[in-house]
Amino acid sequence: MKWPKIRLRRVDVERVLIACSAALVLMLSVRGRNMETEPYEEPLEQIPVSETAASASAKALQQTVVYYEDGDGYLVPVQRDVERQDGIAKATLGLMVQSARNDMDAARLGLTPVVPEGTTFDLDISQGHARVDMSHQAMETADRAQEENMRTAIVWALTEFDTVKDVSFLVDGQKRSALTHGTDISGSYTRVGLNQEEPAQETFAGAQEIQMYFPAQDGRLLVPVSRTIYGSDDVATAVFEFLRGPKTDSGLETPLPEGVQLLGVSVSGGTVTIDFSSEFVKIAEQSDGGVQAIRALMLTCTRYPGIRKVKILVDGEPYQLPTQEVPTFANVASEVETQYPEVMTIE
């Protein structure tokens, strides 16, 4: 199956290549000196590959959620397996800092880290509040958009942990009102406004924010989008907004076929049943058979409390979905890397 190419900014790829080249030169230099000075030793007995693999797999792992940026400027949550450790929240922030290793890990997914290179963190979590003390390198973002993404990514990454409800910021131990390009860091921040769509008009009292998922154009990742609505924040409203799709200039894919209509939404016993018009069957013509579109719909629905399953009808008749498994997370690093091998292009 042929998948669209991933777009990476040239500056990101150049940073990775420069760092890797420097590391290679240093390694060869050290190796050359060792060859000149060290006496010959008998090679050590080779350890069977099966034993080393077993040793590696025996390491205790835990899951964490890292927020990266894609080529269109969206923040994308990715679930990664990391070695079990104390201070996992601080370690998660470290994975979002630009470096040779982090850049390469993100590039495999078509993404980039959001925190400037060299940034370090001190983290204090108490009674549901996380205070993040960033080093001065955090002030070195390229522009306001990257700065806002950094703040939002840190807040959302930390509030993935049950022990954190809100986040505040310091820079080099000092309270600041704003970052270099004007992004406010004077208050405490919660999980709102992830990839917020620009409202079509000025918002008024009664506005609410709902979150949906849409496929990225390369087909590999699902991107969460926050949309302002007027009305009830319930699963029926979410399905209706999902059917409308992303904004035309968003860079995201419209998940459902053109012309499909919503005939009804009902909830019973933890299952939401959605009835679409006959045009829905064209979803099977998508390059992946509609798998990512269905996963996006399932994630949009199951984020509502009590909903655990999604059932699709077409003109009132049951429709066999291309995937029956309800995803537990939008993007799992190991799955993205293995299921959707890609060729990266440089812009």
Where are these regions (language model features)?
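Bimodal "functional hotspot" detector
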Residues: M1-E347
